[in-house]
A protein has these predicted regions:
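Conserved "landmark" site that anchors the functional core of diverse proteins
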Residues: 1-167
Length: 167
């Protein structure tokens, strides 16, 4: 059983009526977005990567784009039965097992202070940390690229220490 809620003409949310473990929304006529439940974390992202690997071989799929704990799938043609697509995606999600993608470490030079630190005083005020503590915490961390952005070279990163998070 599928419950459907119209949000506006080009997007409708389609969720399972009995379980809301993952949420699927239609984005236009040929695209669907599966959003992982729970927190923004590596566990959910690893399942998204696994789901992306699973659906890439679907013959009717034009493209799949992993995002931040979500996956956008774009079909070659408008599906005749959107509810069947939702069921297929949710089943694939339920069967997805965590994977870890091989990558490489890239060191990015960072300049702390001066004209590059316009938000550092606000961060220090919010966190209660000194500027040296903020720099140390930020510098010691290793960040993982969860997804690529729409601009070349832009990566969405995970791994920021909560002590230096800015809303």
């Amino acid at each position: 059983m599928i419950a459907t809620t119209n949000r506006h003409a080009s997007q409708r949310e389609i969720v399972p009526a009995t379980k809301s473990l993952a949420r699927v929304s239609s984005i236009g006529a040929r695209s669907f977005l599966l959003e992982a439940p729970g927190d923004f974390d590596l566990v959910a992202q690893r399942r998204i990567w696994a789901l992306s690997q699973t659906v890439k071989d679907w013959a009717d799929l034009a493209e799949n784009i992993p995002g931040m704990t979500n996956l956008l799938v774009i079909f070659k043609e408008t599906p005749e039965d959107p509810d069947a697509v939702v069921s297929r995606l949710l089943e694939a999600w339920e069967n997805a097992r965590s994977i870890d993608l091989k990558g490489k470490t890239i060191e990015i030079p960072v300049h702390y202070g001066g004209e590059y630190a316009t938000d550092l005083p606000a961060l220090c005020d919010l966190s209660g940390l000194s500027d040296r503590e903020v720099v140390r915490i930020h510098h010691e961390a290793t960040y993982r690229v969860f997804a690529l952005g729409s601009a070349p070279g832009f990566g969405y990163l995970h791994g920021l220490d909560p002590r230096i998070y800015m809303p």
